[in-house]
Amino acid sequence: MTSKVNKIYWDSTAFICFLKRMEGERRKICEDILYHARDGNVNLYTSTFTITEVIRPQTVDVAGTRLISPEEIADIQGMFEWPWVKKIDLDQRVARKAVELERDYGLSTADSIHAASAVVAKVDVLQHWERKDEFGKISRLVAVEQPRMLTYRAVAQMPNSAHNRLFRTAAAMVGQQHLRLRSRP
């Protein structure tokens, strides 16, 4: 059973939480939403700008001081090629809306791009894991929340075997961690 939310926008923090094993519960919630997107129960959107934000922090947060390799970058970029993650191009229309939101609501440039992408795509909700609530400023334009489980009575702890069978289209490598992304049974 899924929520009545059909169109979800993720900013970069949701993807980063999905990639990091240490995120625990947040990561499980992101996996649940990705399952629902993969299975066609919800439509998941993000900006093409998200790709740069997701890969850039990995150089410090996950991989230590070394730069991530071109192969690691390609593996992470593969996540953004999943057909169930719909990309919103940072085009003239989104850029104009971002400028307006930055001016009117005092959002950072990055947050204004995400907010503008969500507004232009007419999503039901913009989801993010940020500690600050910058997106709350635009809640009259689009609903804003932290990602949440969509599966009714979702288990609090996914068995290891469930994670090993996760998703079918890519293998994302973050630093020394390998996340196998395959279909679940």
Protein language model regions, located:
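Acidic, PIN/NYN-like endoribonuclease modules and their adjacent C-terminal/linker elements
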Residues: 1-7, 36, 115-185
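Hydrophobic helix-cap positions at the C-terminus of alpha-helices
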Residues: 36-37, 79, 101, 141
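A short secondary-structure junction motif
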Residues: 15-27, 49-72, 100
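Internal catalytic-core helix/loop-beta-alpha segment
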Residues: 96-100, 104
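Conserved glycosyltransferase catalytic-site signature
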Residues: 12, 48, 92, 110-115
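Extended, non-globular alpha-helical segments
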Residues: 74-79, 86
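PIN/NYN-family metal-dependent endoribonuclease catalytic core
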Residues: 7-10, 28-64, 82, 86-90
